[in-house]
């Protein structure tokens, strides 16, 4: 109910949440909350799922949309390190490799990939 109210108050054009088949429980819960609010809200917006660590944490992720993050990659790395409880030093190399791979898929140096949720009637 809180997520739905937030969406209806803020009226976003787009929301990015975690991929629902993620090995991290908190990520799965977040994804379900956002998806349910998206379905229940009377407000229309695009819903995208992002990946955390494909193959290790984000399972069965098949992108439908890519973004060139070459110009903002360094800022993204800085933002990672603000999440101090997660020990980003240990995963930064993996994230760089994933972003290089996604960049190759969209013909850039660094990229991010997403899956766009398609509306399906119940």
What are these regions (language model features)?
Residues 1-122:
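Metal-dependent de-N-acetylase/amidase catalytic core
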């Amino acid at each position: 109910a809180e997520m739905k109210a937030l969406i209806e108050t803020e009226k976003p054009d787009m929301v990015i949440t975690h991929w629902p088949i993620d090995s991290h429980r908190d990520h799965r819960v977040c994804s379900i909350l956002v998806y349910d609010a998206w379905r229940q809200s009377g407000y229309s917006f695009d819903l995208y799922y992002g990946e955390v660590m494909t193959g290790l944490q984000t399972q069965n992720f098949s992108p439908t949309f890519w973004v060139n993050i070459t110009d903002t990659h360094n800022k993204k790395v800085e933002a990672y390190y603000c999440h101090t409880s997660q020990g980003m030093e240990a995963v930064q190399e993996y994230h760089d490799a994933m972003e290089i791979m996604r960049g190759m898929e969209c013909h850039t140096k660094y990229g991010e990939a997403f899956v766009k949720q398609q509306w399906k009637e119940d």
